[in-house]
Amino acid sequence: TQQLVKNVTGDNQNTVKRKVMEIYRAQELEKRYEKDEILEAYLNEVYFGYSCYGVVTASLKYFNKDVSELSLAECASLIAITNNPSLYDPLQTDWGLENNRTRQLLVLGAMLEQEKIDQAAYDAAKEENVVFSNGYTILGGRVDVDTDKKDDTDTDGGDEQPEEETETATSSQSY
């Protein structure tokens, strides 16, 4: 809750006054909202790198999928990024990919320990081959999908058929 308050207010001063205000605001939020609502708000505000704010843009950036299509392993990999987007970035470097995997396993382990998932779900997620995709560009939290598609409107009166949509080249990494 305090992290949500910090993200929303944008106050990054390292002062006692800021911290006290953050605690107070967090307590006020917890009086008004359920934990699930606070978590949802946090997940829609948290930074994932590449100008991605929120899980919706992050799922498109890192997996080229809608957030509703993510597996447990992919969700844990995204959550891993929030701790330190530069350190746990699976797309930048091999060590970022390795760091993300280590953190993903830590997230899954915490979920198992807190009984948010069972052993079978943990084992399946741990064994899943997670493939990261870099097929989308996120600009300012908005998704910019690059596709080449000819206009369906025939302006010269010919019998030319519209070209089929071509996919943009993507790069990917996996563990």
Language-model region placement:
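Non-catalytic, structured segments within soluble enzyme domains
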Residues: T1-Y175
